[in-house]
């Protein structure tokens, strides 16, 4: 099964959500005791336009809806409870009476003729589309042509559905308080997979005019390729989403709209798709009451709807929309607005003004408001449903784990009410359609609800809120959960424009965070799956130590089933790199109290620690400066620095004025993520990492004085000074890594030359090959994209891997030769061993470095990466220097954010505006009259008729910025290569053919590396001791 798959359709339904012919109305059990029949109101009855005698569309009603003696008594329904049948349902039941409330006819018929109230789940509004008489499947219409009003037009209309419902609906009321009533323990058993859906259930609020603004235009979930596995029916009826039996609407939807048959003057339907014959009988002679008209639309289709007047909620367009009954019937809790309605808010302001402009979220509307302890954000761009389901499953497991901690003062069975999951999609037109379908299947998104413009203001974000009760299993299958499933409060923010991840975080922190005021914020990327209890361990670090302002866990490479992914050397090398970083680097920095980077893919922050002070200065202000680093006035240093904006946030948090926050590493928390498995992906990813980390490290070193404005103790400040020296030394080594590696290669090959002249015939060609590969990398990096030069980059990495194998052979050969020389001189002693330069400078230093790797891995009880990934890392490590570093510095000018031309306001969703006499009301404006359509068309022709202005070619600001960045790139690259070349020349040529200086330098270099490894080992050991007593 692919992620996103839903459980098989319930009994009596096909794969598209439609009831089968053989079981259109299956007998239902008696889940409730029988009650008396509801009183029957005067009702209307329509004739059948599909009959052979029909000459026109439905018109005047016949006031006779009572059951006839010839009709068997079927099911009747309790109007107060839409899901409660009163008596068994037969294949043909009596008509469900309509309310007596009448409205003015939409087509200008005499007002004296009463019209039935509109069907509340999205009935068509055109004059040809009279109201649904009832949810049952057989609807009778008046077939007498004499009943047609004089002005009735029998030709199909090609305009938008018309009609205006003047009833004013109030905004969504304050949600009822559920904190004390609903709990996990009171949730009944989940709905079994084989439950029978009754296709004749009337929808909630049937005949209730107060909800018509929602139900007349019930959203249609339209996709390029609707997938029945998500529970998305392929019906083109807007009502088929929530009421399976309420899809038998007859309306003129306009030319070519969804392929629905249109009615001609003789009462027959134009068979647009060959599904019907126009007389109510299908091609096979069977009754067509459940026939689907039209193919799957390849675009977002237009819905039949009525112009509505909707009162604004606190000045904003806020809608509460019924969720589909197909979804609700799979949920154990079916009462309460948070479970039965999805809340939509059209946000027209900047994220920083969200609270100031009086926008709010559901959690603040309860009485008392719900307190949010954990606020989890999942940022995504265009990732597919597989990655999203993986992340969402991990989050659901963690929330379920929190609800099982019955002894906790914070969590327990109602712990899900203290967690809000926020999903931020970067661009409405960029989101993956299948991921959007997953969100719709969970209930937190519905197509066709959003608007582009509200009262002249462009919508910046579409916010959907819903508490889902569905779950995602290990295979990515969506459906009812088991006994461990708990509700999940979900907040889906669909940004109108693509403005990158840092803008998504601004929505999370400055808009939603400012509204909910959470305690701990957890950051996740789509594709990263936290462990089943990892989020709890992250939260526990904040709960134990009040001075912890940020924390992170271990990032684990996805190994696949039976660790098959480790067969790829790229994945294995990254697995070793991640493991050693989590064993040595992160524990060391955690002991210091300052972790240079909390990965944005899996980290957590205390919300109050990130807030700015009264003057507006603080971590969040500096963090979001990076969002403006794509303008023409941005400097290249700042632009590259904010490629690693999470490093900036960490430094600003530790050095916050008059505070003493520290960062902590939580070994018990882990998250699994995909790592690049191809060379182009790895090269592109590391370019951003290397450039961002390098310039961010320079920023923290240059602004180290900020530390003195904090309230850290003298001891903590001294320890941070030690870490400053350590980080500076690491940065110097990273800068000269290119030259140092070549020196190591030269020393090893020259040492072999001293053992015999035959080695020269191998070493001299290898030197030329090394230089040629390096130059090849420079040429590729300056003019070729990794994705477009996959063979070139891959061949370079393979070439450096072969050179590394030769260097390993040389090191082992020299080690053995050194031991033989010492043994030949006499007894093997320590002084004799250290007296041999080659053995002392090369072998011992390398053994010390990698020996510490093995010891620290054993102490951490994680030795397996040394067995499965160590050798692959040794082969790929030279490419980290000679390929990845070269590409990063050659493209230091590439800081584009990809948002050029994104200032255009889309209008494909439509706009709403306030009425002239009441600013608190908005109406949906649709072109109806043919003259309006012609006027728009004439305006377009006039634009084409005008002569185009002469184009004047000028150099744009973007071009000037690009030229400036390229010049800086050239200068940085020149300085980097010249300094590394000067180092090589000084070390190799200063002694005039004698290799003693090069050998000595090599020994100092290797012992320095061993010393740094030992320093990291001490920090890792200290962390393990502290963790032992901290109770993590």
UniProtKB/Swiss-Prot annotation:
Keywords: Cell membrane, Cell wall biogenesis/degradation, Glycoprotein, Glycosyltransferase, Membrane, Transferase, Transmembrane, Transmembrane helix. GO terms for molecular function: chitin synthase activity. The chain crosses the membrane at residues 728-748, 762-782, 796-816, 842-862, 870-890, 972-992, 995-1015. This is Chitin synthase 8. Disruption phenotype: Abnormal capsular morphology: lower fiber density, decreases capsular diameter. It catalyses: [(1->4)-N-acetyl-beta-D-glucosaminyl](n) + UDP-N-acetyl-alpha-D-glucosamine = [(1->4)-N-acetyl-beta-D-glucosaminyl](n+1) + UDP + H(+). It is a multi-pass membrane protein. The gene is CHS8.
């Amino acid at each position: 099964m692919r992620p996103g798959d839903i459980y098989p359709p319930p009994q009596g339904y096909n794969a598209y959500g439609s009831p089968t012919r053989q079981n259109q109305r299956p007998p239902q059990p008696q889940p409730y005791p029988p009650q008396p029949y509801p009183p029957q109101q005067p009702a209307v009855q329509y004739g059948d336009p599909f009959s052979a005698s029909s000459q026109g569309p439905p018109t005047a009603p016949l006031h006779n809806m009572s059951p006839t003696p010839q009709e068997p008594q079927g099911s009747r329904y309790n109007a107060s409870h839409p899901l409660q049948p009163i008596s068994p349902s037969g294949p043909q039941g009596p008509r469900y009476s309509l309310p007596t409330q009448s409205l003015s006819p939409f087509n200008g018929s005499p007002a004296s003729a009463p019209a039935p109230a509109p069907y509340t789940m999205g009935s068509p509004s055109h004059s040809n589309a009279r109201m649904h008489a009832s949810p049952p499947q057989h609807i009778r219409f008046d077939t007498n042509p004499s009943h047609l009003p004089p002005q009735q037009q029998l030709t199909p209309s090609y305009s938008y559905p018309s009609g205006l419902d003047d009833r004013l609906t109030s905004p969504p009321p304050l949600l009822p308080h559920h904190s004390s009533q609903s709990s996990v323990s009171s949730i009944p058993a989940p709905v079994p997979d084989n439950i029978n859906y009754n296709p004749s259930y009337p929808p909630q609020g049937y005949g209730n005019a107060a909800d018509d603004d929602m139900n007349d235009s019930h959203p249609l979930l339209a996709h390029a390729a609707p997938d029945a596995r998500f529970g998305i029916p392929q019906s083109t009826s807007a009502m088929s989403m929530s009421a399976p039996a309420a899809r038998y609407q007859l309306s003129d939807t306009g030319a070519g709209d969804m392929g629905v048959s249109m009615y001609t003057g003789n009462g027959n339907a134009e068979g647009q798709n060959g599904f019907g014959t126009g007389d109510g009988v299908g091609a096979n002679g069977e009754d067509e009451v459940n026939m689907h008209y039209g193919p799957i639309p390849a675009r977002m289709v237009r819905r039949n709807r009525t112009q509505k007047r909707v009162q604004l909620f606190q000045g904003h367009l806020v809608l509460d929309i019924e969720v589909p009954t197909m979804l609700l019937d799979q949920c154990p809790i079916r009462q309460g607005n948070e479970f039965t309605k999805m809340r939509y808010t059209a946000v027209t302001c900047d994220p920083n003004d969200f609270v100031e402009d009086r926008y709010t979220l559901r959690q603040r509307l309860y009485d008392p408001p719900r307190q949010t302890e954990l606020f989890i954000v999942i940022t995504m761009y265009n990732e597919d449903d597989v990655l999203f389901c993986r992340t969402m499953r991990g989050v659901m497991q963690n929330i379920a784990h929190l609800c099982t901690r019955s002894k906790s003062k914070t969590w327990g069975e109602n712990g899900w009410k203290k967690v809000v999951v926020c999903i931020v999609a970067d661009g409405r037109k960029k989101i993956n359609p299948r991921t959007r379908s997953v969100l719709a299947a969970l209930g937190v998104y519905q197509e066709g609800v959003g608007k582009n413009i509200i009262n002249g203001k462009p919508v910046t974000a579409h916010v959907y809120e819903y508490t889902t009760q569905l779950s995602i299993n290990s295979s990515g299958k969506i459906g009812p959960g088991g006994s461990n499933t708990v509700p999940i409060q979900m907040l889906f923010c669909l940004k109108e424009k693509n403005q990158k991840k840092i803008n998504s975080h601004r929505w999370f922190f400055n808009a939603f965070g400012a509204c909910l005021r959470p305690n701990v914020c957890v950051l996740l990327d789509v594709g990263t799956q936290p462990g089943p209890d990892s989020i709890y361990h992250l939260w526990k670090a904040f709960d134990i130590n009040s001075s912890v302002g940020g924390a992170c866990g271990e990032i684990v490479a996805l190994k696949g089933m039976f660790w098959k992914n480790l067969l790829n050397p790229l994945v294995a090398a990254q697995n070793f790199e991640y493991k050693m970083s989590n064993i040595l680097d992160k524990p060391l920095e955690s002991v210091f109290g300052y972790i240079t980077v909390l990965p944005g893919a899996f980290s957590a922050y205390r919300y109050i620690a990130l807030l700015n002070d009264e003057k507006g200065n603080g971590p969040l202000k500096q963090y979001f400066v990076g969002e403006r680093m794509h303008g023409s006035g941005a400097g290249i240093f700042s632009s590259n620095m904010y490629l690693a904006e999470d490093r900036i946030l960490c430094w600003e948090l530790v050095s916050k004025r008059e505070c003493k926050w520290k960062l902590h590493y939580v070994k018990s928390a882990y998250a699994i993520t995909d790592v690049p498995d191809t060379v182009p992906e790895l090269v592109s990813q590391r370019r951003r990492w290397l450039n961002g980390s390098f310039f961010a490290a320079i920023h923290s070193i240059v602004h180290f004085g900020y530390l003195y404005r904090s309230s850290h103790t003298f001891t903590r400040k001294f320890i941070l000074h030690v870490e400053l020296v350590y980080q500076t030394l690491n940065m110097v080594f990273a800068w000269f890594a290119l030259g140092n590696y070549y020196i190591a290669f030269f020393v090893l090959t020259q040492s072999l030359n001293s053992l015999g002249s035959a080695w020269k015939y191998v070493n001299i060609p290898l030197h030329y090959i090394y230089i040629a590969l390096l130059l090849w990398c420079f040429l590729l990096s300056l003019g070729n994209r990794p994705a477009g030069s996959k063979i070139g980059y891959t061949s370079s990495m393979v070439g450096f891997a072969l050179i590394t194998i030769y260097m390993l052979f040389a090191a082992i050969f020299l080690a053995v030769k050194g031991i033989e020389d010492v043994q030949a001189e006499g007894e093997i002693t320590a002084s004799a061993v250290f007296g041999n330069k080659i053995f002392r400078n090369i072998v011992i230093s390398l053994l010390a470095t990698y020996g510490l790797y093995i010891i620290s891995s054993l102490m951490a009880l994680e030795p397996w990466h040394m067995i499965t990934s160590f050798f692959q890392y040794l082969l790929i490590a030279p490419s980290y220097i000679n390929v990845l570093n070269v590409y990063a510095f050659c493209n230091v000018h590439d800081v584009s954010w990809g948002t050029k031309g994104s200032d255009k306001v889309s209008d494909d969703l439509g706009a709403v505006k306030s009425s002239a006499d009441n600013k608190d009301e908005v109406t949906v404006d649709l072109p109806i009259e043919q003259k309006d359509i012609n006027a728009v068309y004439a305006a377009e022709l006039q634009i084409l008729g005008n002569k185009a202005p002469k184009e004047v070619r000028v150099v744009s600001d973007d071009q000037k910025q690009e030229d400036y960045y390229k010049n800086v790139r050239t200068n940085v690259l020149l300085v980097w290569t010249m300094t590394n070349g000067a180092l090589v020349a000084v070390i190799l040529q200063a002694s005039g053919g004698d290799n003693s200086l090069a050998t000595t330098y090599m020994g100092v270099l290797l012992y320095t590396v061993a010393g740094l490894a030992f320093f990291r080992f001490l920090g890792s050991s200290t962390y393990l001791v502290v963790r032992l007593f901290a109770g993590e």
